[in-house]
């Protein structure tokens, strides 16, 4: 628990991608106070530029493919083309909806999100600009496959 200092938490997590937010959510379930530091958007590469947008685009391609092959199962349908503006709008809506849901969940769990680039400055502390966050239990490095 905190000791009265707003920048002291049980757990300080550097990175808010899939590993970081999963850790933060579980820690909050266990009653830990949690700060999560992110220089981009909560959800990381997977949600914003990787897994989720790719799967949304693949879903649109599968719909087009099924439409093109509909006659083979007795369904009369024609594929008149692919509207890439519409496909990208669909992808963006999927990402936006999931991001809103995730940020709402993080907020509802009382997790503090600190925007900025964090730097490990001690075994129990991370510096974000002029702000120093101290962890009483652990600092978790969840910066992805490589730091940038």
Residue ranges and their predicted role:
Residues 15-18, 39-40:
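Glycine-rich Rossmann-fold phosphate-binding loop(s) that bind the pyrophosphate
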Residues 2-9, 26-32, 37-148:
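Glycine-rich flavin
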Residues 19-23:
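Short glycine/serine/threonine-rich phosphate/pyrophosphate-binding segments
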């Amino acid at each position: 628990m905190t000791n009265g200092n707003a920048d002291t938490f049980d757990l300080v997590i550097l990175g808010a991608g899939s590993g970081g937010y999963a850790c933060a959510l579980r820690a909050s379930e266990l009653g830990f106070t949690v700060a999560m530091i992110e220089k981009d958007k909560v959800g990381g590469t997977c949600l914003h530029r990787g897994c989720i947008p790719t799967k949304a685009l693949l879903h649109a391609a599968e719909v087009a493919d099924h439409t093109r092959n509909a006659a083979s199962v007795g369904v009369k349908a024609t594929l008149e083309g692919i509207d890439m503006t519409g496909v990208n709008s669909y992808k963006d809506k999927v990402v936006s909806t999931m991001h809103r849901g995730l940020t709402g969940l993080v907020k509802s769990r009382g997790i503090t999100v600190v925007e900025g680039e964090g730097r490990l400055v001690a075994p129990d502390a991370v510096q974000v600009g002029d702000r120093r966050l101290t962890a009483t239990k652990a600092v978790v490095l969840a910066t992805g496959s490589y730091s940038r």
